[in-house]
Amino acid sequence: MRCETYAVEEAEPIAAVAALIDAHRPDGRRLRELLCLLADGPTDLAELVRRSALPRKTVEEMLAAVGSDLAREGGKAAIAAGKADAYRKRFGFEQLSATRLADPLQRRLADAVAVQRVMEHVIAGAPAALTELDHVQATPETAVRRALWLDSTYDLRGAVVLCVGDHDLTSLAVGQVTPGARIVVADIDERILQYIDGWAARLRLDIRCYVSDFRFWLAEAAAGCADLVFTDPPYTPEGMTLFTARALQGLANKDHGRVVVAYGYSDRHPSLGLQGQAAASRLGLAAEEQLRAFSRYEGAQAVGSASDLYVWRPTSRSWQLLDGVVSGMQANIYTRGGQSLEGAPQGGHSGWSAMPPPVLRVTADDGFQLRVVAASAWTGAWAGQTAGPARIRLGTLFSTGIPAGMMTRTPFALAADLRADPGAWLLRVLLAANADRVAAVVPSGHRDVRDEAGQRALAALVESKFTLRFLNGQPDAGNTIVVATAVSSGTSVATWLLRQAHGKIGNVWRDALLAADTGEPALTKREARASVEARASRQEILSARLIDLPRHQLALLLEECDDVGGT
């Protein structure tokens, strides 16, 4: 009889749960904590994943094991009331409660309720995530926890904190928690930069925003600026390596600076964690801390809607390895979309051989000569290409412009393959390329071409340098060719700035004033500089490059200088 009773008991769900927990030993405690959540009351799957920091598949396995002992209602589940006591006793809920470690940030979180309320409001109104760039929104509490932890761990008074990417809006939390810090944000998404900029002004925070696509360049104003860098990169080995390398480039304090990284992986696949941590090894970084499941997200359920927080410190070897790592990186670093690792083109074709013929034809209209072809790094090496136009990578164009040796004969044209443009490339190609004609192919859904409003806004930004034509549906229904033709050379400050987008704004503006023929006595350099500073509403951008400014700041700058100089 005793054997028969045992067999019946072991067939019950509670036995299946015990077997599942035993299979995870010694990490079974996390599954017991999941059971506590189920015993506390009805909870939906997303919340179970986020609060337990367990992969969705593991949570689903637990729900399947509990099976008929679950009570389900409206998409939520809980251990049935009549079964809860048995689970509490069998899996030692009291022991879990008695031995659970205290949250070291609990007191500070209680004192930061006002900051969290602000962050809830800020994050609720943020631009939608771009899934192709691996954007998954961190919770408001996570943004505040990051800020509190940084403030409790480091002396950030008077320090510079750089955010290498900031879709989570961590910069706004840090600014509120540590108002004595200056914060620099570099991001590819100009919507996010404008949003951060607006909130920084509203909250009176010292935050400076610059455009950067880390696959090609880090904004000059962000390079070598920081005492501490925070980044939450794409969760691929390539993304982790690239963002960490850019974080290193952002450090000014090479001896005592720190790189703080959020990186998540499923504990069902620890090799992915090893691959991510290998980025630190490739860059000669010493690991100082790893805080498990520190950040929580509204999504990313495959990795438990959570990521660990790593602290890395550079060594002398880091600076020896850095340039080689950056130069060897590819552009496909994300987990989804055309710029994911799976989306990389096969066969190593070059942008030149793959450039749509209609793009090449429009560069030859009206007597222009196609001299330069630009494409992104993901299109492969230029091996074997010796004839035809000169070829440059977008990284070169964005960083330094067209090399002087390629512009020896005029009129000349540049063709650019921007079919992988996430949104920031087209404007920056027009800023960087001092060509007589530029023809660029972009996706038809691109913000600058998808409707008349976007086209007008882009044309207005560059009107002192180019006139634009938009060939919709060319070379095919999914793309648009943008044709830019240089306008007659003018002497306005706007023209100077647009034609010297890689120079420091303050210097270029000053030189434009010195060169202007106004009929008034010539200005001295000091007088010209004083005039620039008097007209610029944001002094910090005078030391930045035009190509690195978010477009909302670029538009404001061109308005401020519009009435200076001739035409």
Task: State where each predicted segment sits.
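A short glycine-rich, Lys/Arg-flanked "PGG" loop and its adjoining helix->strand segment in the class I
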Residues: 241-258, 426-436
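A short acidic, Gly/Pro-enriched loop at the edge of an enzyme's catalytic core
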Residues: 215-229, 236-237, 376, 392, ...
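C-terminal substrate-binding/active-site "lid" region of AdoMet-derived donor-dependent transferases
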Residues: 245-301, 307, 442-466
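Short hydrophobic/aromatic beta-strand or adjacent loop that forms the aromatic wall/cage
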Residues: 304-310, 477-481
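S-adenosyl-L-methionine
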Residues: 2-162, 167-176, 186-224, 228, 365-405, 444-454, ...
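Structural motif
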Residues: 164-167, 187, 234, 264-266, ...
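Conserved S-adenosyl-L-methionine
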Residues: 176-183, 434-436
